[in-house]
Amino acid sequence: RNPDEMYYRESDGWYRREVLDTLDALEANGAVMEINTGGLARGKCHDMYPSEWIVAEARKRNIPLQINSDAHHPEGIDSYYGAAAERARRSGYTVQRVLLGGEWRDVPLDIPAELGMPPEGSSAR
């Protein structure tokens, strides 16, 4: 957490370099990056993370993406899924990486019902 940029500014050159180096490492190792909505859902943050510019940079590198609510209770499992999917779409993503039946698959962002999630808007948080 970095409320109101208390500790650093994401626009600072050193921070941007660290983020880009980290994304390069994710790409080199075939790792998946997540959009995490947990802090937003629990009221601890004003936004999901990572920031939109980071998601866009990940897309440029074709880093697989996963949306994660970091839910601590079942009722929060889909918290802000629609907003996270929209952030991913704006950056050019059309799928997210999901573990289904013991294997990783790329699943379209616009069909959360396939994942057993309610239709968009039915459990607005």
Mark where each language-model region is.
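Short, basic/glycine-rich phosphate-binding loops at helix/coil junctions
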Residues: 1-3
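Charged catalytic cores and adjacent phosphate/nucleic-acid-binding surfaces used
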Residues: 6-125
